[in-house]
């Protein structure tokens, strides 16, 4: 089913003479046969899920109509990726022959078209969508070395998109999201093949147009498959936000960018999208017939995830199944010169680093555990261990080697490096305490989403309007908001607040959820002591309490009271707070009792 994006043909057998068959594991008697089609209507190598008329129609079409032409090159990518992966997995030359033949056919066709026709085709919504075909063609070119294959990859250049992205000009408003995200992964592969800087610049700048400017808290992007204006988050939330394919392709792009620039922001995003949207897109039950993955993940109040989309078979079912095979593929990276090992994700895994003759075994229940242990096995080797310090790990990140603390100051959103000659049995223990925090919608600071470390917490409630929640009432001197929540016994990462249970977004249930809530702090309260004073706000929505707690962590109660007094004085001077109310606020802060 190519339209579902099931680009996974590695288990098919190939036989040009009698045909290879693959037995249907479901027992329904369906088999698969795939062989090279030398008798294509226009050129050898034609292999598609459509007749050639679909490709011809696309070339003459000036407007999109996916009921007549539905993305023939998108489907070609799925087939090409599948047969290419079959070759990479099995080294069966017949699979490579299929892939090469497909690209020979595409080059013979597309190279004859005027540039204006190509630009018009690739700019058409849906009909001109081609997914990750450029990446796949570049992968093939790396094997065959055929100049025609590299030239073919460049025939998919969408000049308006490349030029604007390379210049860091944001033109994403109104574009179909998943039609364009994988294009930039292809541009990175073209940069690898050609060294042309504008491809790298375009991909890097594009990523920055999505993260954070069009990103929901779970790492997803798009609403109704399309992007809206930059920095509009609250204004785009709907039942059709966060198409699952978009998260899949943003992970691929982030991973590929990291190959070129080892910036921790790419892996911070990777962790966010993987541990929230991607894990949460799969229902937590088995099914022999259906993949049970989401198409959209609605972020409206009380939304119930649909794991069997009413739209029928979707692209997201295919990428959803692929995602389940890729949980491990960005945990570790080695430096190009072999001098360092990057630990990007904290996930139970084992790395066999053959060049160094060592293994690294990671033992953890992260994110249900706030630590992990790396154990070196095999021989001994000298290298730098670069441990990602997540951007959310703002306090308490600690590393020990064989029980001894490693000196240094870990900086959130960076790598903490431990260099030594490693020997079998060495143990590296990493502790990273989680803190409760909020992230605010860029266009409405009162609309917020809740995180505990890397984990997005969602309220389970059938209410169809946003929950109204306050979090400052029991905030501790550290600024951690966690004391405002009550843990649920026997259910890791579950808490209650104001009578509502909050659970990890990644749990694939059919509970109605609230990913966003309305922040409501109507009165100034410290340590559960109510001053009786209304919590005033500036024109941008920032409240008095927001400004006070922005100074956290506080070394002592006295430091907090000093912050309260100086903030109150500024607000009184600005006419936002009366002198009498200001005195009440300071007095309440002085009398309250605080958690650490």
Regions found by a protein language model. Give the residues of each.
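Carbohydrate-binding/catalytic loop surfaces
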Residues: 45-70, 119-138, 167-189, 220-243, ...
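Extracytoplasmic low-complexity segments
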Residues: 1-40
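Well-ordered alpha-helical segments within folded domains of soluble proteins
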Residues: 71-87, 126-141, 175-192, 240-258, ...
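Solvent-exposed beta-strand/loop surfaces of large extracellular or lumenal domains
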Residues: 394-419, 438-443
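Long, well-ordered core segments of solenoidal/helical folds
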Residues: 37-45, 58, 97-114, 148-168, ...
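C-terminal beta-rich recognition modules with glycine/proline-rich loops and embedded aromatic residues
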Residues: 203, 267-283, 287-375, 411, ...
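Soluble extracellular-acting proteins and domains
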Residues: 522-596
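Extended ligand-binding groove/face enriched in aromatic
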Residues: 37-155
């Amino acid at each position: 089913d190519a339209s579902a994006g099931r680009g996974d043909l590695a288990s098919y057998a190939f036989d040009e003479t009698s045909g290879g068959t693959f037995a249907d594991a479901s027992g329904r008697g369906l088999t698969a046969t795939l062989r090279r089609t030398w008798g294509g209507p226009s050129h050898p190598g034609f292999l598609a899920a459509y007749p050639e008329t679909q490709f011809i129609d696309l070339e003459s079409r000036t407007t999109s109509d996916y009921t007549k032409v539905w993305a023939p090159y998108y489907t070609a990518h799925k087939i090409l990726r599948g047969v290419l992966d079959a070759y990479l997995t099995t080294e069966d030359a017949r699979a490579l022959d299929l892939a090469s033949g497909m690209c020979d056919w595409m080059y013979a066709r597309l190279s004859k078209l005027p540039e204006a026709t190509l630009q018009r085709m690739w700019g058409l919504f849906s009909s001109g969508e081609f997914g990750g075909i450029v990446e796949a063609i570049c992968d093939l070119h790396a094997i065959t070395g055929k100049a025609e294959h590299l030239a073919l990859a460049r025939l998919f250049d969408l000049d308006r998109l490349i030029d604007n992205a390379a210049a860091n000009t944001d033109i994403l408003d109104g574009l179909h999201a998943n039609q364009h995200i994988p294009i930039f992964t292809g541009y990175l592969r073209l940069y690898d093949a050609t060294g042309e800087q504008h491809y790298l610049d375009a991909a890097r700048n594009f990523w920055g147009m999505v993260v954070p400017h069009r990103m929901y808290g779970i790492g997803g992007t798009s609403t109704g498959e399309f992007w809206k204006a930059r920095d509009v988050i609250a204004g785009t939330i709907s039942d059709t936000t966060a198409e699952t394919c978009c998260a899949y392709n943003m992970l691929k792009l982030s991973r590929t960018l990291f190959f070129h620039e080892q910036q921790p922001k790419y892996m911070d995003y990777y962790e966010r999208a993987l541990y929230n949207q991607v894990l949460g897109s799969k229902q937590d039950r088995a099914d022999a017939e259906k993949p049970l993955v989401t198409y959209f993940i609605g972020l409206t109040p009380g939304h119930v995830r649909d794991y069997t989309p009413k739209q029928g078979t979707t692209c997201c079912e295919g990428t959803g199944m692929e995602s389940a095979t890729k949980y491990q593929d960005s945990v570790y990276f080695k430096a190009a010169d072999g001098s360092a090992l990057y630990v990007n994700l904290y996930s139970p895994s084992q790395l066999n680093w053959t060049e160094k003759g060592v293994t690294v075994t990671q033992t953890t229940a992260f994110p249900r555990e706030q630590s992990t242990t790396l154990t070196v096995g095999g021989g001994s080797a000298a290298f730098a261990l670069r441990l990602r310090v997540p951007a959310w790990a703002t306090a308490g990140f600690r590393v020990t080697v064989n029980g001894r603390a490693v000196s240094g100051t870990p900086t959130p959103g960076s790598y903490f490096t431990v260099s030594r000659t490693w020997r079998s049995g060495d143990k590296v223990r990493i502790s990273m305490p989680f803190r409760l925090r909020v992230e605010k919608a860029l266009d409405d600071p009162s609309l917020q989403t809740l995180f505990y470390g890397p984990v997005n917490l969602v309220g389970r409630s059938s209410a169809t309007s946003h929950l109204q929640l306050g979090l400052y009432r029991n905030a501790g001197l550290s600024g951690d908001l966690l004391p405002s929540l009550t843990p649920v016994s026997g259910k890791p990462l579950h808490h209650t607040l104001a009578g509502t249970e909050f659970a990890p977004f990644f749990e694939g249930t059919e509970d109605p959820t609230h990913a966003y809530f309305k922040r409501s702090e109507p009165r100034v309260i410290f340590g559960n002591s109510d001053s009786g004073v209304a919590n005033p706000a500036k024109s941008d929505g920032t409240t008095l309490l927001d400004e006070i707690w922005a100074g956290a962590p506080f070394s002592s109660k006295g430091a907090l009271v000093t912050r309260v007094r100086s903030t109150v004085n500024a607000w009184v001077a600005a006419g936002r707070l009366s002198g009498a109310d200001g005195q009440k606020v300071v007095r309440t802060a002085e009398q309250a009792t605080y958690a650490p």
